[in-house]
């Protein structure tokens, strides 16, 4: 029996946008089988027990052109904010290598909730929703285990427990309700969640540190067609995209999107604008912005 939807974001199931099943949680966090592209992002700033400052970013990207070809990738980056250095790692699961006999997809993504793994060349990667002692999902609470290798050959690993402090926000606030045009594709969905609390362990080469952070950022998009399909005319180079998250000292976070038409002198295109997230106010949206 399906549980009734709740207006309390701290409980599942939760309807972020009334009347739109695409933004019903926990399903919105998981894989969308009817979409050719599905993307998961998590990023944040971390402080080590030693006082050192780090940041990280990871991307899981599921691509199924024509719903038959596997063209996925996983990216993990660590940033040493004190020294101004960074390491990035990306593992691809692309044709023709993954079309060889016996090849299996590297990425597994569950439907109905977030439970995702990727078998990278640097090791096994996981991002999944935590469960309580009764095996019930704990809303927006994740175990994240990321691995990679930096350009110098040093191993990178980040193990985090991530917990929420505020509700997810539909991109564009009440004006768009999370349903936008992206890279020329209408009916693209996106939400984000900021103020995520993170605790865990960072390992990078010979460095091993216990880390914490309170400015974690989860971001999601899912596209009816492959994300770089080029929209109606099929030109995959027609659009460019800038995306920023800014965390202000007053507790307001900004998700800023700007899209441009490369074929028309980089004219600004929809969806573009800034959406706010804060702990004590409804999200707001503005499209008249300068960056």
Residue ranges and their predicted role:
Residues 2-291:
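Structured soluble/peripheral alpha/beta segments that form catalytic or ligand/cofactor-binding pockets
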